[in-house]
Regions:
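Bacterial Sec-dependent N-terminal signal peptides
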Residues: 1-23
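Accessory carbohydrate-recognition regions in carbohydrate-active enzymes
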Residues: 23-166
Length: 166
């Protein structure tokens, strides 16, 4: 009887140990959470206290156009809205969760073909350099972001170090 108890206890401990090894806290992180509506978060990459917060931007809406406040600008203060179907570029500085505009990002956009200097409209991306994307090809995990830019056939992959984004 005593032997049976020891065996059951050891098997239970072994199973618990294997379960703990397979699951790390980082496995539960989903950077997409909070990227829609007024969540003001971005799905991109950064390191703790890093200089770079590299992430896609789905639109850039100015706060003021000809003296008129743009009410949708507030939704884009982190640069990314999950509901959007296009990416206008990737930038290296973002604030997450602040609810305030961020750092005057400079966009980079990989592309092939003719040079286009206008981002185009979300409803007609062909007139500019923005590209459609599909969430099925988007991957966001701590330290890594990937998305297929459908209009260019380019897989964009992002990661960051303490002082740079790649």
């Amino acid at each position: 009887m005593n032997n049976l108890r020891k065996k059951v206890l050891m098997m239970t401990m072994a199973a618990a140990t294997l379960s703990a090894i397979a699951q790390q806290p980082v496995d539960y992180v989903n950077p997409i959470i909070g990227t829609n509506g007024m969540g003001h978060t971005f799905p991109g990459v950064c390191t703790p206290f890093g200089w770079v917060q590299l992430s896609p931007d789905t639109d850039t809406i100015p706060h003021n156009v000809n003296g008129a406040y743009q009410k949708n600008a507030y939704e884009y203060c982190a640069g990314y809205q999950y509901r959007d179907k296009t990416i206008v570029g990737f930038s290296h500085t973002h604030l997450s969760g602040t609810g305030h505009s961020d750092l005057g990002d400079i966009l980079l956009m990989p592309a092939v073909g003719d040079v286009k200097l206008n981002p185009g409209r979300a409803d007609y991306p062909e007139e500019g350099y923005r590209s459609r994307f599909n969430h099925a090809t988007e991957k966001a995990v701590p330290g890594y972001y990937e998305v297929m830019l459908d209009d260019y056939g380019i897989k964009a992959q992002l990661t960051a170090t303490q002082r740079t984004g790649i």
